[in-house]
UniProtKB/Swiss-Prot annotation:
InterPro entries: DNA_helicase_Holl-junc_RuvA_I (IPR013849), Hlx-hairpin-Hlx_DNA-bd_motif (IPR003583), NA-bd_OB-fold (IPR012340), RuvA (IPR000085), RuvA_2-like (IPR010994), RuvA_C (IPR011114), RuvA_C_sf (IPR036267). Has three domains with a flexible linker between the domains II and III and assumes an 'L' shape. Domain III is highly mobile and contacts RuvB. This is Holliday junction branch migration complex subunit RuvA. Keywords: Cytoplasm, DNA damage, DNA recombination, DNA repair, DNA-binding. Pfam families: HHH_5, RuvA_C, RuvA_N. Belongs to the RuvA family. It comes from Streptococcus equi subsp. zooepidemicus (strain MGCS10565). Its main location: cytoplasm. It is found in: Cytoplasm. Homotetramer. Forms an RuvA(8)-RuvB(12)-Holliday junction (HJ) complex. HJ DNA is sandwiched between 2 RuvA tetramers; dsDNA enters through RuvA and exits via RuvB. An RuvB hexamer assembles on each DNA strand where it exits the tetramer. Each RuvB hexamer is contacted by two RuvA subunits (via domain III) on 2 adjacent RuvB subunits; this complex drives branch migration. In the full resolvosome a probable DNA-RuvA(4)-RuvB(12)-RuvC(2) complex forms which resolves the HJ. GO terms for biological process: DNA recombination; DNA repair. Residues 1-63 are annotated as: Domain I.
Amino acid sequence: MYDYIKGQLTKITAKYIVVEANGLGYMITVANPYSFTDCVNQQVTIYLHQVIREDAQLLFGFHSEEEKDVFLKLISVSGIGPTTALAIVAVDDNRGLVNAIDNSDITYLMRFPKIGKKTAQQMVLDLAGKFVEAPKEESSKLPKAKHQENEQLDEAIEALLALGYKATELKKIRAFFEGTSETAEQYIKSALKMLMKG
């Protein structure tokens, strides 16, 4: 098992990033690949969780150990796999998640992609009280960059689709942000907050 990787970030796609270490390029699935935009061709440290399946070996990456810890607790719940847990971590509202679990707010939990009533109830049952302290939000994980708005919005929508959100939900998001100028990372964060509000 791997705990973290240090290396040069060489590629960003809608679903994953590539970090080169010792001559090997590691494909790492992350919640919001565009949050790494300003780190291309720079040294990064990514915290990892490895999933080994019969047909694939996958690496899931995180900005911090706290984010990884939330992910690990989520995948311990029956009915939540790594992809769903990553979509939940992507919302970047860990306080809201912890409060919803501790207060049995099933409606809030069902707003996450692929989380139905049974799974939301299981989350409450398995995780209530497991978060000693709500994870800290990292407001300045990485510096922001300015890019062309349409391209950035397209990349954000593509990343949200990769997280499991439906195209019909994202049509409203696209319409809301048309004419604005943000980075893909900022679009994703804002869109996730809107999607969680319902």
